[in-house]
Every structure is written in C-alpha cells, then in structure tokens.
C-alpha cells in the first residue's frame, strides 16, 4: 500500500466550531461541505452526495517523511503498513476482511507531508468505516511481532520499488542533492539501516505524537446525512484524547548558490535520462499558480514546447515531463527527459535549457495560457468524479491551506495567471545557480546481476 484558501463561515456550537462553504459562482463545479472541529482537535469535513449509494471515509494525518529525524527515517511509511495490523477491537487482518466482505475497498498512502488512510463502502455500512478508523486511532496494536513483520515487508518493498528499479537511485538522489534541510532530503520509504534499527518503543512514541485527533483531518463524502453522520463521528472519535502538539519542523531551505550535478551509472536502465530540479516556493505561496502554469506550457500534451521542439522536431528525447512536485514546500520544479536512442544526454540537456531561456525572453502565446486554464478546469471536474477523490482533496486543502473552501477556487486562481507572471517565476527560479542535475547513464550489469 503505498498525490490549491477557501470561503468559510464560522459559528460556535457548544465546544465545536462548525463551518459551511458555498461555491464561487465563477469557479465551475464545486464541492459543498460542512466543517466541524471537535473538542479534541479533530477536524471533521462532511460532504453530502446522493449520486450513488456509497461513501468514502478519509483520515488525513499531518505526518510524513518530513517529520522524521535523522536515523529514524521511514517511520511514516512504516505506519502505512502497521495501521492495518490490528487494534484493540479489530484483530490482525480483520480490517481488510470487514471492508472487503462488506463490498468495500481500502488503502493508504504516504508522502513527504502527510499520510492518508481511506475506505469506500456501501452507504448502509457507515458505522463500519467510522468504527474501524476510530479504533485504530485510539488503540493501534504495536507489538514486536507486528513491527518485525511489517519492517520486512517495507524493506522488500524498497528492494522491489527502488533499489532494483531502473532510475530508482537517480530519483532518490535528486532530493538528496537538491535539499540542504534534512526534512526533505531522504526518501519517504526510508533507509534499510534505519528500518532495521527501529524498536517497538521508537515506533510507539512516533504513533503517540503524530496519530492523534488534533493532528488529523477526517473527511466523509457520499450518500449520507451530515447531521446523523456528525453524531456518529462524535460518539466514535470524540473521546479519543488529544496529545501535545507535534514539534514543528523547520522547513527553512538555504538559498542555493551554484549548480549541483551528479552522474549515475545504472545497470537497470536501457536509455539515458536527464533530470533537472529547481527549488520553488511552498504551495501556499502566491507564486505557486504561476509555477504550475509554467509546467503546463513546457510539457503538458503534444502541443507543449518541450514536445514540439525536443521530441518532435529535434527528436532528441522520447519524452520530456515538467512540473512542480506535490510537496508543501519549499518544493521542486522537476524536468525529466528520457534520451532517445542514439542521442546524448548533453544534447538533451542543452535543448531543455534553450527552451527555458526562450520562454523567459520570448512571447508566451495567449493560447498557451488558455490551455493551462482549460487543463485546470478539467482537473477540477475529474477530481469530483468519485467520493474518494473529493474527500482526499477536502482533507488536503484543510490541512495545507487551513482554508477548505479554497478547493472551489482552483480554476478561478489559474485564470488570473498572466504570461508576465509565468515569465517572472521562470526567470526567478529556473536559473543555473538554483539547479540540480542528475544524469542517468545505462551501463552493463556487473557479473551476477543487480543486488
């Protein structure tokens, strides 16, 4: 089991704060929701939709690999596995069985900034999803046997998904080289050594700090009655005690003053690849929308600049992708170009840099901006197609921006981005001094194969 503030009306109800959001008339399809904060700090977002007799429940914990300290990496992702190994009233494997036997699906995912757990179930099984998530938040079963079992599973996942995958080392190296702050330098899955060294006490302490109601957002979306659902949530989650606020991570990133570069000889890669990464401001920055439009102009679709020039005309690369990563930030604007057979990484890199310089100084056509706006509108629509995706987005906006209603302003915000905005962020951030380059070169495997 391995992904931008909004209008909010606030009024007090007993010990809770409840919010309701109305969509902007200019932002297209919107999500209606109510938001409540329980006395223990849990934020509860409910969105009613009777399109289908199902609902999705999402618990968004504000913990990711950025919260891990050196020597204890991989803990957030480890819990993505541990959280399905049983709690006080749910035995090992029973979480899966109860969900699947009642016609549901479930999963979890971890990134640098957050961990998600979610289920989609028939509407008549609302109590089940709430019960399962509350029980493991309250009383996760953390034992040596569970830890050893899931530690081995995660280590094998690392071997298969990173260590023995083409370009795996290169992908990990980009963050290691680009960042000075240790919070984002290491991979989400962690190191083998740190996973091996983790003790039950280490893991239990991490759980107590971060998997608490005051460090989480609960979103339930689908065929439900918000008033009835809120009372069920209060009953199940309301008595889980809050914990002291987790330590705040200093995300300050020193200004990079010179290009950083490394070559990786990869026995698993069949084609060379050039990766460039530029540091960009946090997702909460006013510049973030322009950075995203920049990525669309450079690489989204066959009409994009990279495709037309580097793939189609010059035939130097088989593919070129560009865009900002999902990190809250400071983030990375990444470019990944797979070198075409018979071409060189040097030629591809030169072509990429030439296109960046052309964008900075030359005109950006009106149709390119319009294309980015249309893509944003399409993303809004596709993001509303399932109760699960709506719930994930609601929780994400609440957590990242502390303004859930911003979810209904995405297309409207992109529509305000101008060509001048795009050229300004390109000139500001896509510079040689702010650049990290990782070049992957295929090489024959050593005798005996990859280890």
Model region roles, listed by residue range:
Residues 47, 52-70, 74-78, 92-136, ...:
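M16 family metallopeptidases and their MPP-like homologs
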Residues 4, 13-44, 225-265, 273, ...:
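Proteolytic maturation boundary segments
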Residues 26-36, 135, 157, 175-216, ...:
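Histidine-acidic residue clusters that define the catalytic metal-binding segment
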Residues 1-8:
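Positively charged n-region of N-terminal signal peptides that target proteins for export
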Residues 85-90, 137-145, 364:
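Short, polar/flexible loop-turn hinges at active-site or ligand-entry regions and domain interfaces
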Residues 75-83, 294:
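Active-site His/Glu-centered metal-binding helix of metallohydrolases
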Residues 159, 176, 245-303:
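His/Glu-based metal-binding/catalytic segments typifying zinc-dependent metallopeptidases
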Residues 151-152, 204-236, 433-435:
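Non-catalytic, conformational "gating/processing" segments within enzyme and secreted inhibitor domains
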